[in-house]
Amino acid sequence: MKMMDANEIISFIQNSKKSTPVKVYIKGDLEGIDFGSSAKTFITGNAGVVFGEWQDIQAAIEANQDKIEDYVVENDRRNSAIPLLDLKGVKARIEPGAIIRDHVEIGDNAVIMMGAVINIGAVIGEGTMIDMNAVLGGRATVGKNCHIGAGAVLAGVIEPPSAKPVVIEDDVLIGANAVILEGVTVGKGAVVAAGAIVVEDVPPYTVVAGVPARVIKQIDEQTRAKTEIKQELRQL
């Protein structure tokens, strides 16, 4: 998987057409009303639903006030620069309530749980689970067969563009509510304890804990048993 360069992301955000999409439930004498070039209308008789940009739909509503009896607007963003990722073709399990922005790469058989937030440029490897309410900041990169625990934060780096992103290598387990700061690499097979704040690189096959996190031991058989990644949870 290719990590997006920070300057690519900055350019994308700068040049994107900012969007305020809305869904409008509307009723009245709607025949012949032009809701704008961005709009998609699903109207039967004197009622229906219109999808499109608020600027266009608002102008149509104001110009046809005498024809419109009532309307309700659903809106969840304003001048948004980055759309959400189209999930329909992703070969992964993605649960309701996950927020995943465009230009995120998700490997096959990954699992994204409810409430996870994944920012532009992040990369998630095959078979990796992102648990509930975890946050992957911009350009955060997670390898294969990892588990990022509930509420964990992998800090993002888009600004400044020279900053090094968080890198989580393969087979890593990050405990609940742990925080991995910018520029940190967590080595292959390592375990980060719940609640740890990691401010420096973690060697492969070690366990770190505490604030700030420190190596407390090498991975042993007991640790492997307690932190086993279950492939059964990743089957589609």
UniProtKB/Swiss-Prot annotation:
This is 2,3,4,5-tetrahydropyridine-2,6-dicarboxylate N-acetyltransferase. Belongs to the transferase hexapeptide repeat family. DapH subfamily. Pathway: Amino-acid biosynthesis; L-lysine biosynthesis via DAP pathway; LL-2,6-diaminopimelate from (S)-tetrahydrodipicolinate (acetylase route): step 1/3. It is an enzyme of class 2 (transferase). Keywords: Acyltransferase, Amino-acid biosynthesis, Diaminopimelate biosynthesis, Lysine biosynthesis, Repeat, Transferase. Its EC number is 2.3.1.89. InterPro entries: DapH, DapH_N, Hexapep, Hexapep_transf_CS, Trans_hexapeptide_repeat, Trimer_LpxA-like_sf. The keyword Lyase does not apply. It comes from Geobacillus thermodenitrificans (strain NG80-2). It catalyses: (S)-2,3,4,5-tetrahydrodipicolinate + acetyl-CoA + H2O = L-2-acetamido-6-oxoheptanedioate + CoA. Catalyzes the transfer of an acetyl group from acetyl-CoA to tetrahydrodipicolinate. GO terms for molecular function: tetrahydrodipicolinate N-acetyltransferase activity. Pfam families: DapH_N (PF08503), Hexapep (PF00132), Hexapep_2 (PF14602). GO terms for biological process: diaminopimelate biosynthetic process; lysine biosynthetic process via diaminopimelate. CDD domains: LbH_THP_succinylT.
